[in-house]
Curated annotation (Swiss-Prot):
Further facts: Found specifically in cells cultured chemoheterotrophically.
Provenance organism: Thiomonas delicata
Protein name as catalogued: Chemoheterotroph-specific protein
Tree of life domain: Bacteria
Amino acid sequence: MLTYTGTVINVQTFAAKPDP
């Protein structure tokens, strides 16, 4: 469960700050 939450946060961060 904790790993899943970490993955979701990581994905949200990448989506909010995509690489150029």
